[in-house]
């Protein structure tokens, strides 16, 4: 008799703009067979579950429902998008105290349910909240992952692709560091077809100010979107579904994620964006990119900023931790 595999189950916590976009992307791509959604607005979740299920005749079969924390017990993946949204004029780090308290109220009941899967944190500031999820949950580092600089890297690929007239998927590029103002592109590596972007810029009569222009455009893109429409959700919702797919399908894929530093880049005791390999068991490998002295200094400055804000927030909120 053929062995019947257990359906892959995902619990989404947070049914706002990002969460619902993530859920829709999961439905469209047929990622996981079961999707439970948790939010304090229970009636809204029930409506979303019905609405999402209406798409399944043209996509993929999926059991979608309004869930409770008890449903996390046998889930493979818990995705956290819940939190106060970033408002015009706010940085992601401005959200930390509000969202740290919200996060604590989520992680505790998930752990108490008997959950033994993987946490994927998407809520902002994602690096700090991912580290907090690890500390609050007591989980191993390989089972707590943040979306990190996945969206920022995608934005960088988009901008470079437009400049060089190539498909963004053909752009080999990374943004590292905080998912926020101190993030930076790795120009010593970033390339298209093996030709460094920095060399392409020079060959086309531009100077290094073009690289700074690209950096600023990518770093400021979220602020531009928020000022124009109030929130960002299509990009991050789709990127988060891509990460979930890589984990659930055991793809062993390299993605720029927020992962725990254990000496990489000389950093310890924080989560920050760097390429990492993920699969069915979560984090499999952290890839430490070789950086120039200038890039290393930017990584250290980004980490320092995160650490200062994080330590202050933990002290002010008094969030209880297991490790």
Swiss-Prot record:
Xref: SUPFAM superfamilies: LDH C-terminal domain-like, NAD(P)-binding Rossmann-fold domains
Active-site residues are 179
Q: For the modification Phosphotyrosine, which residues carry it?
A: 223
**Alphabetical GO biological process terms:** glycolytic process; lactate metabolic process
Q: Which UniProt keywords apply?
A: Cytoplasm, NAD, Oxidoreductase, Phosphoprotein
Principal localization reads cytoplasm
**Catalysed reaction, written as an equation:** (S)-lactate + NAD(+) = pyruvate + NADH + H(+)
The metabolic or biological pathway listed in the UniProt record of this protein is: Fermentation; pyruvate fermentation to lactate; (S)-lactate from pyruvate: step 1/1
E.C. number, please?
A: 1.1.1.27
InterPro entries attached to this UniProt entry:
L-lactate/malate_DH, L-lactate_DH, L-lactate_DH_AS, Lactate/malate_DH_C, Lactate/malate_DH_N, Lactate_DH/Glyco_Ohase_4_C, NAD(P)-bd_dom_sf
Record keyword Phosphoprotein present:
yes
User: What cellular component terms from Gene Ontology apply here?
Assistant: cytoplasm
What HAMAP family does the record point to? Answer: Lactate_dehydrog
Record protein name field: L-lactate dehydrogenase 1
Q: Which organism is it from?
A: Lactobacillus acidophilus (strain ATCC 700396 / NCK56 / N2 / NCFM)
Q: Which gene encodes it?
A: ldh1
């Amino acid at each position: 008799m053929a062995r019947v595999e257990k359906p892959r189950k995902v619990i989404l916590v947070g049914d706002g703009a990002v969460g619902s976009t993530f859920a829709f992307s999961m439905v469209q791509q047929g990622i996981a067979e079961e999707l439970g959604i948790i939010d304090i607005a229970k009636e809204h979740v029930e409506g979303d579950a019905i609405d999402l299920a209406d798409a399944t005749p043209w996509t993929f079969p999926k059991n979608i429902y309004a869930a409770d924390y008890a449903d996390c017990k046998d889930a493979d993946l818990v995705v956290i998008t819940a939190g106060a949204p970033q408002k015009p004029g706010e940085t992601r780090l401005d959200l930390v105290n509000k969202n740290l308290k919200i996060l604590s109220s989520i992680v505790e009941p998930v752990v108490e349910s008997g959950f033994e899967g993987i946490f994927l944190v998407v809520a902002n500031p994602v690096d700090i909240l991912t580290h907090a999820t690890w500390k609050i949950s007591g989980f191993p580092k390989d089972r707590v992952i943040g979306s990190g600089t996945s969206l920022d890297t995608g934005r960088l690929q988009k901008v470079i692709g437009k400049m060089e007239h190539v498909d963004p998927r053909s752009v080999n590029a990374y943004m590292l560091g905080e998912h926020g103002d101190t993030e930076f592109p790795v120009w010593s590596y970033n390339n298209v077809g093996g030709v460094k972007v920095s060399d392409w810029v020079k060959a086309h009569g531009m100077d290094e100010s073009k690289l700074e222009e690209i950096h600023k455009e990518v770093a400021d893109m979220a602020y531009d979107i928020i000022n124009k429409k109030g929130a960002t959700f299509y990009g991050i919702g789709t990127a988060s579904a891509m990460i979930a797919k890589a984990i659930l399908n055991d793809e062993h894929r390299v993605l720029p994620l927020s992962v725990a530093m254990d000496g990489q880049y000389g950093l310890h005791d924080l989560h920050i964006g760097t390429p990492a390999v993920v699969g069915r068991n979560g984090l499999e490998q952290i890839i430490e990119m070789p950086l120039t002295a200038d890039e290393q200094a930017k990584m250290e400055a980004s980490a320092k900023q995160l650490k200062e804000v994080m330590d202050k927030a933990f002290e002010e909120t008094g969030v209880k931790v297991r490790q």
